[in-house]
């Protein structure tokens, strides 16, 4: 594509002129708001807007940097650098406004001074060009006489080269005005620029500039009579300037590339008026010439020639300049090669319309496409204002060569002229050069010795290719034998037309880019991806996808759309761009639109009709159309519902392909639809997992034909479209004639036995008669037994009368209706529903005279129907011999309507009554109005009840009664009148041609007749008629043209009523602008609508699309102004606005013309939009809610307004105090002043202060009124009362203070005593615990003493802590018995640790499927899409996410480096999502798959640290907690203990426990007796547990016997022993509850001998102690003790009771005792071993810091939170709370509570927020409040040490991870994990497939096909296999 340059002129002069002066363009929305409103994509047909960037100021130019993927956008006062892909802002620079004057030199000119005032001036960009060779962006604006800057490529905000360059004072740089005056210095003057590449061996780049002259004498020069013109001498119209920044900077922007004025083209001063040049574009062609080829620079421009010039001279010009080529090429002067020729775009086929003004050009490879428009004001401009023409560059070249030949060889003054009269040239006219042979280069580029510059007088002509109104820009691409043309419009739309090779339009589409904003005349394709087009409107930059092919779902639609870009991707069965289709470069893989729909894949199935009862070996498929060879591909025939059979392709044949396919199994045939004898089956050929072509075949069943058509069974069988045969004897339809018996059978439908139609007389109800039924073709069933059926349960016998007649005997039918028709059919006797054919069914009518005939006329009138009825006090049946009754009574007329009619007659008169004739003939000539006959209408006559007749003409006005004569005469009470209606006038007499005008026609007697018509122009009805006696109102239809039309009033479709009525259709009203364009969301703001011809508007309303509430009614002020209250809206947004004028939707005529190009676009958008913003908010100045005011005093309110963007004016505010208005005096942006000038009333009261804006009302305060005397009295009383209260309070305070002092001293003494006791208790407890723990530490064997879980059990417990979709975790162990060593091995089981249990029959397929699925999971693209697809499902709960993450960790455990890369990618997505909201909340919970993956990754990586460093101090802390708890009393029922860290588990009773040292032996253990310490308050179960702990302390807990599995026996003496139990007959009962037995209860002394033994059968009489019912049992404390009131029973009153809170000091005691062990643990966790640094932590923390830096997150608190959430809170807190994940121990509820307190302290230590502690703070936070600051320092030091570690490379980390994988390989069965992951894949298979289809990489690598293969392998038997397993 050739680079081009755009001028900085306004986008459209027509658009600029459309707005009248009072309505200037309103301020634009700020960028963030517009981004919110406009970033959504819009789509229409085959165009799709991908991205938009809104500009607050009008846009001027843009440039593309294809190599860097950058867009540079220039707007008024701003420069933007945007990302090319999404138009996001990368950099920006402010370049205005600046103080400037067009009469002053640029301030960059040294010693420049100016006497004229400089005013703040906006900077309009004129040139924006990229110079990639020097890394520059050339930016020229309208300020400072068109000054240019050289900015840095890649950073538009930085200036790359300072110009003029700075120089030392000793050597000043010479700067001339011509170096500064580059571009035009007026906003509306055009400028184009083009960076010319340097010639080989030459210097730097050059800049070609074309600029409209703005100096003295032009319309752009200031009209101040100043002659000071800096433009003429310094700014030529066309010039080539230096851009060489690597050479002498002092020569930048100079002309002197060669020392001659010929290097510029400057129009002479005297010729400037006649040659005003307006530049459109500058471009190179060819843009990339081959080496040695000539390249040209072109300028497209308009020459505004004045009247008097030659009529034939074209106004649109194309100028060409030669550029140097090759190393030896000389740089020619500009004027040497300059030549211009006219471009003329004129209508063909006899149309003389000329499009003379050039608007936009686009150079294609062979053609120059140009948009032209007619001059403004042309009479035809409204019909077709713009056209597209195409000129061949070859024709341009030929015309130039011919012109130079005509100038120098054989001069022809009518062909070419020298521009010497216009510019400084080399001679006034062409002259013949003798003895000179012009070389081709001279013919193309001229020479110094030849006349120049030249102008070709005859224009190059072209016929319009396309016409449309308001075209502003063009871009063209040649694609797939089509030419795709994109056209911008003045109304902000983009048209896309596709031209064939003959340049004829074959399709068109329209999309709205920014309605109402003209599209800039330059559009460019993305250099990196031609599938996108960049364009610019007045306030937006847009990136448009050239085609949205995916809107077409079939090949026919895709190819038939004739879109140059779209084609059918055969093997992917979708409409795509060619580059989006795999293998599209190969033949037949991609079918373009140019190939036509006939090349679409098609298929024929043979046989196409299949008998359901016949066996078929297979199907033959003939596949035609554009398809690659299917031979060797994986193929199947797909019948739907997952039914597929194998297909085979032997090879191509005769231009198509043949395939063979097995028919689907018979048991899988689809069911036949109801009442149908066939079913159509759609069969598709499936290739590589996709159905690429389909066809239908039919399965038929002849036997169903007879069932579907039972009354024409034989006829339907033999006339069916299938080969069916009729068996007469079986009365059945078969597909094989051999199934019929040998008897003769009919062979054609005409031979079928059938009943013949025979008319039957009506039968009275209940009568008996015989019915004869004639038959035909009876030879096939002569003599067969038949029955007569009438559709009832009752069947009548049929008797053969002869060979062709059957009689139905004694048929009796009944009905309760007036009459009822019964169908008559013959069926085979004893074979229901087997009927003889009845092609024309016989029927029997049964009537009932007693029903439906309330009067005589109706009764006797039934005789015409064959009903034998008579009238005798009612309608009755008469016998066949009874005579007819006589005449009926005279007619009775109840009502007539209407009561009047015109003299011409024709009125439909309706007469209602009784006995109005028995038949029409009775009254046919018997209806009269006076002496005028009224003719009844047969089709409107109702026997006896109603007559509708047409009145005849009357000789004159008359009035008479209506007479009906039906053998007797009846007359009406009302009179009917003949009158003469007249019309006089109509109003209004004019209206818009859009229709909707409500007119009123005045006259007399206009209410007459039955039908009224008002016709406009004799054809179009005036609708919504309403009439009175003197007027008719109706709504005018739409008119075709502005013209007068006659209006005709017709009564009864007769002639027009006399009176000449004329209505004038006028041009429609035009709306040009609305202001303001912002409204509060509540609506009601007055919107002023400006336009023309509003005097014809009767009513107008305003409605808002999508978010608007009810439309609002507007008010017409005059012919140019309308005011409308803005409608309320549902939300804050920008929405299109519609106006309804006279009930018709307003439409701009130009927009309507555009919409006709694409009817879909007619429904899109509106020209006007309203931006809805939040309602304004107000308050009083001091935000008080009550304001006091004394009547008589002046009242001035100061109201504060919150800042908003509504731009409200002072008259839009209404402030009221009660019902009194407050006059607004001062309004600023934030403050409103108002005052009240009238009295508010003297009565004391309260008045609301309300402020109103539109429909929004806000009460901001209440005004309190009161008298001044009353206020003084009230103040005195209040002060007196306050003084008295102060004295009393002072006395009370002194008394209380003395008492409090005494109490405080007493309390201090108590606290000192308590503190002393606590210190002593801690000292003793710590000493004891240290002694015990020292002994324990000595006993621990470093390798075996700590019961660490194996790695695999650590992993399963950590990954699946509670339950997952895989299994519900239960650590259930078999019954254990101690062996001689006192231990029993019981291995914990888990599905992931065992074999994959599936039956052998299923194993091969499933193992292959799992293997393939494993390879998919090891594909990064698949796994990322897979995880995201599942997480998007609403029913994919957190539990499922965690389960999936853990299963993935197990499945990928052998590839931790790959697992880590996946986790990082998912984390990046999570960080992106969190960074956009609140980054500090990231990783706070575990709610996504990646968060659980991170937990698992940390668990794996930290296991070694956990086991080698943290495990021992952690285990010692657990033992210390247990030892400390066991030193005091523990309530076995409630679990509460004397010593604890948790307030909830504190035993708040002072129960003294004494230790007992017991000598215990364990029978069968093989160990000596041990001394075990217990407390005398221990229950026997607690004693057993302590004994078991003593004997099994070096054995894992899972191998311990349980307390209920052993008995404890006390040997009180050598002869006495007792089995000790918690409950027995000796248990004590208190308050109805049994107390558990303790050592004290049994009075077991110190040193007692006990024996413990295993029991064979567990005693189930007593369950777990803590599960006992507290209503029946207790241990230490009755359940009511802790909740009881101070009053107790006498029996309990001896207990010493104190406040329960006093025992909270024991928490401190326990904490102090355990402090050392806790400190050791925290230091182990938060320290770094030099020999084994935490590589994973360093790696992950560095990753977090890198991500934060990428997103500009510099807050250290955020990084601290991320690190804390990822390691301490995610891993260590989990371990601290769950020691059973690490050790094989018993975690009791009490230990769990203590660990929760410790974990909370760890969490607080990692937090950065200060602890807000008070008296109500929980004890678990207060307990370690003093230590938290020290712990925090340790945490921060740990983070700092991690940060200071040497960074890890990816290779080092991968090596570490690989080592971790190797260390624990083969620990888990990954097949089980894969199978469980597959269950999720199966559950969400459609969603996963859709996600894979939507992912380009997945489509390219066919991941969806591989996934389908997994499903195919797994689906057939996975569930059966699992059920068997």
Swiss-Prot record:
Give ranges for the Cytoplasmic compartment: 1293-1925
What biological processes does GO assign it? angiogenesis; aorta development; branching involved in blood vessel morphogenesis; cardiac septum development; coronary vasculature development; dichotomous subdivision of terminal units involved in salivary gland branching; endothelial cell migration; kidney development
Q: Which UniProt keywords apply?
A: Angiogenesis, Cell membrane, Cell projection, Developmental protein, Disease variant, Disulfide bond, Glycoprotein, Membrane, Receptor, Repeat, Signal, Transmembrane, Transmembrane helix
One GO MF term: semaphorin receptor activity
User: Where is composition skewed (Low complexity) in this entry?
Assistant: 1-18
Q: Residue limits of the Sema domain?
A: 47-546
Which SUPFAM superfamilies does UniProt cross-reference here? E set domains, GTPase activation domain, GAP, Plexin repeat, Sema domain
Residue ranges, annotated region (Disordered): 1-23
Protein's cellular compartments: Cell membrane; Cell projection, Lamellipodium membrane
Disulfide-bond pairs as recorded: 104-114, 140-148, 322-445, 345-389, 549-566, 555-600, 558-575, 569-581, 637-661
Q: Name one Pfam family in it.
A: Plexin_RBD
Query: Which ranges does the record list as Extracellular topological domains?
Result: 47-1271
Signal sequence range: 1-46
Would you say which domain of life the source belongs to? Eukaryota
InterPro entries, alphabetized: Ig-like_fold (IPR013783), Ig_E-set (IPR014756), IPT_dom (IPR002909), Plexin (IPR031148), Plexin-D1_Sema (IPR042719), Plexin_cytoplasmic_RasGAP_dom (IPR013548), Plexin_RBD (IPR046800), Plexin_repeat (IPR002165)
- Residues covered by the IPT/TIG domain: 891-979, 981-1066, 1069-1160
An annotated GO cellular component of this protein is: lamellipodium membrane
Q: In which tissues is it expressed?
A: Detected at low levels in heart, placenta, lung, skeletal muscle, kidney, thymus and liver. Detected at very low levels in brain, colon, spleen, small intestine and peripheral blood leukocytes.
Q: What Gene3D superfamilies does the record tag this protein with?
A: GTPase Activation - p120gap, domain 1 (1.10.506.10), Immunoglobulins (2.60.40.10), Phosphatidylinositol 3-kinase Catalytic Subunit, Chain A, domain 1 (3.10.20.90), YVTN repeat-like/Quinoprotein amine dehydrogenase (2.130.10.10)
Stated membrane topology is: Single-pass membrane protein
What family does this chain come from, according to its entry? Answer: Belongs to the plexin family.
Associated disorder, per UniProt? Congenital heart defects, multiple types, 9: An autosomal recessive disorder characterized by congenital developmental abnormalities involving structures of the heart. CHTD9 features include common arterial trunk, tetralogy of Fallot, interrupted aortic arch, right aortic arch, ventricular hypoplasia, and hypoplastic left heart, as well as other vascular and valvular anomalies.
How the protein assembles, per its UniProt entry? Answer: Interacts with NRP1 and SEMA4A. Interacts with SH3BP1; they dissociate upon SEMA3E binding to PLXND1 allowing SH3BP1 to transduce downstream signal through RAC1 inactivation.
Q: Which PANTHER family match?
A: PLEXIN, PLEXIN-D1
Its job? Cell surface receptor for SEMA4A and for class 3 semaphorins, such as SEMA3A, SEMA3C and SEMA3E. Plays an important role in cell-cell signaling, and in regulating the migration of a wide spectrum of cell types. Regulates the migration of thymocytes in the medulla. Regulates endothelial cell migration. Plays an important role in ensuring the specificity of synapse formation. Required for normal development of the heart and vasculature. Mediates anti-angiogenic signaling in response to SEMA3E.
Q: Tell me the protein's name.
A: Plexin-D1
Q: Which organism is it from?
A: Homo sapiens (Human)
The organism that produces this protein has a lineage beginning with:
Eukaryota, Metazoa, Chordata, Craniata, Vertebrata
């Amino acid at each position: 594509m050739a680079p081009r340059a755009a001028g900085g002129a306004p986008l459209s002069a027509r658009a600029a002129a459309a707005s009248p002066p009072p309505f200037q363009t309103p301020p634009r929305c700020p960028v963030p708001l517009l981004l919110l409103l406009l970033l959504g994509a819009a789509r229409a047909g085959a165009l799709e807007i991908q991205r938009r960037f809104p500009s607050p100021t009008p846009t001027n130019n843009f440039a593309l940097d294809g190599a860097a993927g950058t867009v540079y956008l220039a707007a008024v006062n701003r420069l933007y650098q945007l990302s090319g892909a999404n138009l996001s802002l990368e950099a920006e620079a402010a370049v205005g406004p600046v103080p400037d004057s067009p009469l002053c030199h640029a301030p960059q000119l040294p010693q420049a001074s100016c006497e004229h005032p400089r005013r703040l001036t906006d900077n309009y960009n004129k040139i924006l060009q990229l110079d990639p060779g020097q890394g520059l962006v050339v930016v020229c604006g309208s300020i400072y006489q068109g000054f240019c800057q050289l900015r840095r490529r890649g950073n538009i905000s930085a200036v790359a080269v300072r110009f003029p360059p700075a120089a030392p004072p000793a050597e000043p740089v010479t700067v001339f005005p011509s170096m500064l005056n580059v571009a035009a210095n007026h906003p509306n003057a055009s400028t184009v620029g083009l960076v010319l590449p340097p010639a080989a061996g030459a210097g730097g780049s050059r800049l070609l500039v074309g600029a409209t002259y703005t100096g003295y004498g032009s319309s752009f020069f200031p009209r101040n009579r100043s002659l000071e013109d800096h433009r003429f001498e310094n700014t030529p119209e066309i010039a080539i300037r230096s851009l060489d920044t690597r050479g002498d900077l002092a020569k930048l922007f100079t002309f002197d590339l060669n020392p001659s004025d010929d290097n510029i083209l400057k129009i002479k001063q005297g010729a400037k008026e006649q040659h005003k040049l307006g530049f459109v574009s500058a471009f190179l062609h060819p843009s990339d010439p081959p080496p040695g080829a000539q390249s040209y620079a072109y300028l497209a421009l308009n020459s505004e020639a004045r009247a008097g010039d030659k009529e034939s001279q074209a106004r649109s010009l194309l100028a060409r300049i030669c550029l140097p080529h090759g190393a030896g090429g000389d740089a020619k002067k500009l004027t040497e090669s300059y030549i211009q020729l006219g471009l003329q775009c004129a209508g063909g086929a006899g149309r003389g319309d000329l499009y003379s003004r050039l608007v936009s050009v686009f150079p294609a490879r062979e053609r120059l496409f140009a948009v032209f428009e007619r001059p403004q004001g042309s009479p035809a401009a409204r019909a077709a204002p713009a056209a597209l023409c195409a000129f061949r560059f070859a024709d341009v070249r030929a015309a130039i060569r011919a012109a130079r030949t005509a100038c120098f060889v054989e001069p022809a003054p009518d062909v070419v002229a020298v521009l010497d009269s216009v510019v400084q040239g080399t001679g006034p006219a062409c002259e013949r050069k003798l003895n000179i042979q012009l070389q081709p280069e001279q013919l193309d580029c001229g020479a110094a010795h030849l006349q120049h510059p030249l102008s070709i007088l005859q224009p190059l002509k072209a016929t319009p290719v396309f016409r449309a109104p308001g075209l502003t820009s063009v871009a063209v691409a040649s694609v797939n034998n089509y030419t795709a043309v994109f056209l911008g419009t003045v109304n902000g739309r983009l048209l896309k037309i596709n031209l064939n090779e003959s340049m004829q339009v074959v399709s068109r589409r329209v999309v709205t880019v920014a309605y109402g904003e003209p599209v800039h005349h330059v559009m460019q394709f993305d250099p990196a991806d031609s599938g996108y087009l960049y364009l610019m409107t007045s306030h937006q930059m847009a990136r448009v996808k050239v085609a949205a092919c995916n809107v077409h779902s079939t090949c026919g639609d895709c190819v038939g759309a004739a879109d140059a870009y779209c084609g059918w991707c055969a093997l992917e069965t979708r409409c795509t761009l060619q580059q989006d289709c795999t293998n599209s470069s190969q033949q037949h893989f991609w079918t373009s639109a140019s190939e036509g729909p006939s090349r679409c894949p098609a298929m024929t199935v043979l046989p196409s009709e299949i008998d359901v009862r016949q066996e078929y070996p297979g199907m033959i498929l003939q596949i035609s159309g554009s398809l690659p060879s299917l031979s060797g591909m994986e193929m199947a025939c797909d019948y739907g519902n997952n039914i597929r059979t194998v297909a085979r392709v032997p090879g191509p044949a005769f231009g198509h392909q043949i395939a063979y396919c097995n028919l689907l199994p018979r048991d899988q045939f689809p069911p036949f639809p109801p009442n149908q004898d066939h079913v159509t089956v759609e069969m598709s050929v499936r290739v590589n997992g996709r159905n690429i072509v389909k066809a239908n075949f039919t399965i038929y069943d002849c036997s169903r034909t007879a069932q579907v058509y039972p009354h024409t069974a034989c006829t339907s069988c033999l006339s069916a479209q299938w080969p069916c045969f009729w068996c007469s004897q079986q009365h059945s339809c078969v597909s094989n004639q051999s199934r019929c018996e040998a008897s003769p059978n009919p062979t054609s439908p005409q031979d079928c036995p059938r009943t013949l139609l025979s008319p039957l007389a009506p039968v009275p109800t209940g009568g008996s008669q015989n019915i004869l039924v004639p038959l035909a073709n009876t030879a096939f069933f002569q003599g067969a037994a038949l029955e007569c059926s009438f559709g009832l349960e009752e069947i009548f016998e049929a008797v053969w009368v002869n060979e062709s007649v059957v009689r139905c005997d004694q048929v009796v039918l009944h009905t309760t209706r007036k009459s009822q028709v019964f169908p008559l059919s013959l069926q085979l006797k004893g074979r229901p529903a087997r009927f003889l054919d009845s092609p024309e069914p016989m029927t029997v009518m049964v009537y009932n005279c007693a029903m439906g005939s309330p009067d005589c006329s109706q009764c006797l009138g039934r005789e015409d129907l064959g009903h034998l009825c008579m009238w005798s006090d009612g309608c009755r049946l008469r016998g066949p011999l009874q005579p007819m009754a006589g005449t009926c009574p005279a007619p009775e007329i109840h009502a007539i309507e209407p009561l009047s009619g015109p003299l011409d007659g024709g009125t439909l008169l309706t007469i209602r009554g009784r006995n109005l004739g028995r038949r029409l003939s009775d009254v046919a000539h018997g209806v009269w109005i006076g002496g005028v006959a009224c003719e009844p209408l047969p089709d409107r006559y109702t026997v006896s009840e109603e007559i509708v007749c047409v009145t005849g003409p009357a000789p004159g006005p008359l009035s008479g009664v209506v007479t009906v004569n039906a053998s007797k005469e009846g007359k009406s009470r009302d009179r009917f009148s003949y009158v003469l209606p007249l019309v006089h006038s109509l109003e209004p007499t004019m209206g818009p041609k859009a229709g909707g005008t409500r007119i009123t026609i005045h006259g007399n007697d206009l209410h007459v007749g039955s039908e009224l018509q008002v016709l406009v122009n004799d054809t179009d009805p005036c609708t919504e008629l309403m009439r009175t006696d003197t007027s008719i109102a109706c709504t005018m239809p739409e008119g075709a043209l502005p013209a007068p039309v006659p209006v005709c009033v017709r009564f009864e479709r007769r002639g027009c009523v006399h009176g000449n009525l004329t209505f004038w259709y006028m041009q429609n009203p035009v709306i040009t602008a609305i202001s303001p364009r912002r409204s509060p969301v509540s609506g009601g703001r007055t919107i002023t609508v400006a336009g023309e011809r509003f005097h014809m508007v009767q009513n107008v309303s305003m409605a808002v699309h999508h978010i608007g509430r009810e439309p609002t009614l507007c008010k017409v002020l005059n012919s140019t102004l309308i005011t409308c209250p803005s409608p309320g809206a549902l939300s804050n947004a920008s929405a299109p606005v519609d106006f309804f004028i006279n009930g018709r939707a307003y439409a701009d005529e130009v927009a309507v013309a555009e919409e006709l190009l694409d009817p879909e676009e007619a429904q899109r958008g509106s020209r006007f939009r309203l931006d809805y913003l939040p309602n304004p908010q107000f308050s009083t100045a001091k935000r008080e809610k009550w304001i006091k005011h004394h009547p008589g005093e002046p009242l001035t309110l100061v109201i504060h307004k919150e800042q908003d963007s509504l731009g409200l004016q002072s008259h839009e505010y209404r402030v009221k105090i009660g019902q009194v208005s407050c006059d607004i005096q001062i309004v600023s942006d934030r403050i409103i002043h108002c005052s009240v000038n009238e009295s508010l009333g003297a009565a004391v009261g309260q008045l609301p202060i309300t402020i109103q804006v539109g429909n929004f009302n806000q009460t901001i305060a209440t005004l309190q009124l009161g008298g001044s005397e009353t206020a003084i009295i009230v103040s005195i009383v209040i002060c007196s009362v306050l003084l008295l209260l102060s004295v009393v309070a002072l006395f009370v305070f002194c008394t209380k203070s003395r008492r409090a002092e005494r109490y405080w001293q007493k309390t201090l003494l108590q606290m000192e005593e308590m503190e002393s006791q606590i210190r002593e208790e801690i000292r003793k407890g710590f000493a004891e615990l240290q002694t015990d723990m020292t002994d324990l530490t000595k006993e621990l064997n470093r390798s075996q003493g700590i019961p660490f879980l194996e790695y695999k059990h650590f992993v399963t417990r950590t990954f699946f802590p509670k339950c997952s979709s895989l299994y519900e975790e239960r650590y259930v162990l078999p019954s254990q018995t101690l062996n001689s060593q006192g231990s029993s091995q019981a291995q914990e089981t888990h599905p992931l640790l065992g074999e994959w249990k599936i039956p052998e029959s299923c194993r091969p397929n499933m193992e292959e499927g799992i293997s393939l699925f494993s390879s998919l999971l090891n594909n990064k693209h698949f796994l990322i899409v897979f995880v995201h697809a599942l997480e998007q499902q609403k029913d994919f709960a957190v539990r499922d996410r965690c389960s999936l993450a853990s299963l993935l960790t197990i499945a990928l455990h052998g590839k931790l480096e790959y697992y880590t890369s996946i986790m990082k990618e998912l984390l990046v997505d999570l960080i992106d999502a969190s960074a956009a909201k609140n980054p500090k909340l990231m990783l706070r919970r575990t709610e996504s798959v990646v968060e659980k993956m991170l937990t698992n990754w940390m668990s794996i990586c930290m296991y070694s640290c956990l086991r080698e460093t943290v495990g021992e101090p952690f285990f010692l802390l657990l033992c210390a907690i247990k030892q400390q708890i066991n030193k005091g009393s523990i309530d076995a029922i409630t679990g509460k203990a004397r010593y604890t860290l948790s307030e909830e588990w504190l035993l708040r009773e002072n129960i003294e426990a004494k230790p007992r040292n017991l000598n215990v032996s364990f029978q069968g253990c093989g160990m000596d007796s041990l001394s075990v310490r217990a407390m005398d308050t221990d229950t026997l179960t607690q004693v057993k547990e302590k004994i078991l702990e003593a004997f099994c302390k070096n054995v894992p807990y899972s191998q311990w016997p349980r307390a209920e599995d052993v008995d404890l026996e006390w040997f009180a003496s050598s002869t006495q022993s007792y089995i000790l139990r918690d409950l027995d007959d000796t248990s004590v009962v208190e308050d109805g509850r049994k107390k558990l037995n303790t050592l004290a209860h049994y009075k077991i002394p110190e040193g007692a001998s006990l024996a413990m033994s295993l029991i064979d059968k567990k005693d189930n009489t007593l369950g777990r102690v803590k599960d006992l019912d507290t209503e029946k049992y207790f241990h230490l404390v009755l359940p009511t003790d802790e909740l009881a009131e101070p009053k107790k029973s006498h029996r309990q009153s001896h207990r010493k009771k104190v406040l329960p809170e006093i025992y909270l000091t024991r928490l401190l005691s326990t904490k102090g005792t355990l402090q050392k062990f806790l400190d050791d643990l925290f230091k182990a966790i938060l320290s770094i071993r030099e020999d084994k640094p935490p590589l994973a932590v360093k790696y992950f923390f560095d990753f977090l810091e890198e991500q934060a830096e990428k997103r500009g997150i510099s807050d250290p608190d955020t990084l601290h939170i991320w690190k804390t959430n990822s390691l301490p809170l995610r891993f260590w807190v989990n371990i601290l709370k769950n020691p059973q994940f690490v050790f094989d121990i018993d975690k009791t509820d009490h230990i769990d509570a203590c660990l929760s307190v410790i974990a909370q302290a760890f969490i607080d230590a990692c937090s950065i927020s200060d602890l807000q502690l008070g008296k109500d703070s929980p004890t678990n936070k207060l307990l370690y409040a003093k230590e938290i600051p020290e712990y925090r320092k340790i945490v921060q030091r740990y983070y700092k040490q991690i940060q200071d570690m040497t960074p890890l490379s990816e290779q080092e980390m991968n090596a570490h991870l690989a080592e971790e994988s190797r260390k624990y390989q083969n620990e888990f069965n990954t097949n089980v994990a894969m199978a469980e992951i597959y269950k999720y894949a199966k559950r969400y298979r459609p969603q996963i497939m859709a996600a894979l289809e939507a992912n380009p990489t997945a489509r390219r690598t066919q991941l969806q096909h591989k996934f389908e293969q997994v499903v195919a392998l797994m689906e057939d038997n996975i569930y059966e296999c699992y059920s068997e397993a």
